[in-house]
Amino acid sequence: MTEHWHIKPFLFRQVFPNFEPLCDFDTIAEMASDEDIESRLIQHSKAGWTLEHGPFDALPSMKKKAWTVLIQGIDHHLPEAYDLLQLFRFIPDARLDDVMLSLASDGGGVGPHYDSYDVFLLQMHGKRRWKIGPLPNKELEEGMPLKILKNFEPTEEFVLEPGDMLYLPPNYGHDGVAEGTCSTLSIGFRAPTQAEVLSCILRDMADQIDQDPGMTQTLFSDPARGLQKNPAEIPDDLLNFGFNLIRQFSAKSPQIQRSMGILLTEPKTHVYFVNNTDDQEIHEIISVLGERGVALSMKTKMLFKDADFYINGDAVNPTSALTVKQLQMLANQREMEPIDAVEALKNPEFQYFLIGFAKAGWVETLM
């Protein structure tokens, strides 16, 4: 980690010996046809590059050269991909993003490009030739539907076979081309931008002012206002009204932490949960969860900091040390064996939270 993470590439040969594909062509085609799953079709010819967004009624024939379909977030839909992602939890969950699948015909790829985040490229089926290199120049081709590097000069080249994996740090150039039909898994890591963080913090601050009865909406006022010499000039006291508001929240780290927790667990656009509002059915589900164990949904993102918890964009604040311990177990293990679930459900506060999670569709039975 200290030598390569965020610093330089590393090639793992046969990190997964005898690696078996997580799914077949029919499953990939089915995911590409699902409107709730993000997919893209990229094709390359003498005329240039084309990009189409799914869902797709059908994929091109594998006999046709130089096309690639990308399926985002397959760990939300395939238990095998979900289990694979768990192997990468040596990095904090807050940084884990998802598993993307790339199926390509001979010659297929997405062109020379770079990612702004760390990525592991795991070969699932067939062979892919990777050309990689540092980027002294990030200039992109103009008029392209994809972000393709204009002057990419690779310094290394590898052919990956099933079970091989290539790690690339952020902003490192790479170009992968299929040699025959192949499929590759990309395990990506989230890197929120400053704009995302600031936007979420400010939005959450505004929500807190609206919802917290202890925080009253204060309008700007200027009872001592004198005559304005320059009518178009913004008054200093009005600017200070804004500055002081930001300072007020900046001094309250728990509120900043809350905003970050919400941002880091907020579901993506294509992630949906099925709500359950039938109280009788919910109590039956809770009973079953006690008997069969509890597991977070494959789509659920749950994080915590000390005694504060964040799940799928919501903040959860338990009051008892026991509940904190039980929720930390659920977040860290992403599941509870029946023996632990039965014991935890004896705690009314934990049961209260679990009922809320079950209603939102965020948990399911373990067995």
Predicted segment positions?
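Long, charge-rich, low-complexity alpha-helical segments
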Residues: 7, 318-367
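Active-site region of the double-stranded beta-helix
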Residues: 1-4, 16-164, 172-222, 364
